[in-house]
Amino acid sequence: MPSVKVRVGEPVDRALRILKKKVDKEGILKAAKAHRFYDKPSVKKRAKSKAAAKYRSR
């Protein structure tokens, strides 16, 4: 779990920005969104193959 220590006199906006960077870097929100709903294995497989096809077409 990322944490940020706010120093005396440091703006809260800066601390929030640092926290957001840490959360993005660790992929916490992405993982939470992925586990929001259950996806059947067939749906996951279909999405994976679709993403691979999109990547190959570039």
Swiss-Prot record:
It comes from the Bacteria. Residues 39-58 are annotated as: Disordered. GO terms for cellular component: ribonucleoprotein complex; ribosome. Residues 43-58 have a biased composition (Basic residues). This is Small ribosomal subunit protein bS21. Pfam families: Ribosomal_S21. One of its GO terms (molecular function) is structural constituent of ribosome. InterPro entries: Ribosomal_bS21, Ribosomal_bS21_sf. GO terms for biological process: translation. HAMAP family: Ribosomal_bS21. Belongs to the bacterial ribosomal protein bS21 family. Keywords: Ribonucleoprotein, Ribosomal protein.
